[in-house]
Amino acid sequence: MISRFLTLAFFFLLYFAEAQNEFITIWQPGITTNPVQTVDAPFQANANQIWFPGIGQNYTIEWEEVGYPSNNGTMINVTSTSQVLIDFGPTREEGQGATTKYRVKVSNGNGTFQQFKSVSYQIIGTVPANMQSKGSLDKLLEIEQWGNINWTSMDAAFANCQRVLLTATDSPDLTNVTDASLMFYLATSFSGAPSMQNWDTSNIEIFKHMFDCRHASQVYISGETFNSPIGTWNMSAATDLSYMFAGRQHFNQNLNFWNVSNVTNMAWMFAACPVFNQPLNNWNTSSLENIEFMFFLNHVFNQPLNNWDTSQVIKMNNAFSFATSFNQPLDSWDVSSVTTISAMFSNASSFNQSLGSWDLSSLVNGLGPLHFSAINCQNYSATLAGWADNPNTPDNIDFGNNTPAQYAANVVNKRDFLINTKNWTISGDTQGSCILSTVEIKNNQKILIYPNPTSDFIYLNQISDAKKYQIIDFSGRLVKHGELKEKWIDVKSLTNGNYILIIKTKEKELNFKFIKD
């Protein structure tokens, strides 16, 4: 008796363990969709069939009718590079064929099941296009269990699965996954689950379009509810977060403790996220290169970002366009690598900050960054003055139409300098009634040395009380020193290389690195 009990217990535990190993999904093959979804397959599945978009070698598929588990089937040694047809046959649920659901369980079997990929697609520009369904995506209702499948990729795993829900309480094995692009792209019913906070994302590099709910036509979809707690994810390997939450109407989770130190691309990340307003000031953005359209059409975001390291950023166009609540100082941003700020604050109807401290030395496209922003006369004047007085400001910039900005009478000469000397094109602004004080103008001028690199002279800007200088080479040796009687220092006698210039004023010492060439 005891022996029989132990034997039964052993087989029960074995069955339970095997059941936990399966990737389980729920399907409704008889459901109708308008318009009819076409699968890129040899033929279209009927009301008792599905195309299962699985990829693997010699894996096993088991299925059963929900509510009638005796109606089941098994497919062994399945090998597929795109999809496999599952034929459920006639339902046991009399008269209910259209609503009959099936539980599909996939295990490694005699080989390996590797990937579930719903669509093939191309990226045209930065947007997914030419999507072709590889499975009966409109018939997939639920992810019930992840099992122990060692996934190799989550690229487009559930893209365009517009009915899919996540009810699994376990976590997928993402150890070997580096790409989660489009994982739930256009999965409009996907609301996530609390279990997502336990996912190990430490090796994933690409998160672009992961939860994006926006058609290639840039139309955003209403009615979705995704707002899962994913603030604990390990993002240390991440490089691309572009479009990650674009168009998600309810997403508002705290992501401030994400490690984004390797991320280069955040373009469109929170675009058209109408409730997202969480702090991001802890982020290490030292690798960041692209923030174009990052907060585009986000009407509530208004969090401090002034401590971001933007020294590597190249693209800032439309970053806060139509971000109608945003009004935070960005005067400490290093924009010296930025090539485009076009429409950056266009229609940002609360933005009223001076940008006069910005170093625009790499700027190529500056078209209309303040068009219909809320910048007032003082801050717009300080911006023009700061840029006019900065020797790094480039020539030949089309600043475009910045209606309805106004400038002070005493910065007309600064604006004229940009137009007549720097060959800028500026339109849409008009002279206002404010007066910019001398202190305000000076506060928008950086302490600078220029040119750098240099071959003969270093010129000093805005160091009025400088008394003495020292030049030290990179071995620590003092190579030149003297009294500062002019606004320049002759360095022609120095050999080519890297140096540190120390300027001594009444109150402090200022250190600058420069290159003699």
Residues covered by each model-derived region:
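Generic detector of low-complexity/intrinsically disordered segments
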Residues: L8-F10, Y15-F16, N282, N290, ...
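Negatively charged
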Residues: Q20-I435
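C-terminal outer-membrane/trafficking sorting elements
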Residues: K442-D517
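Generic structural signal for short, solvent-exposed loop/turn connectors between secondary structure elements
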Residues: M1-F5, Y15, Q20, I55-G56, ...
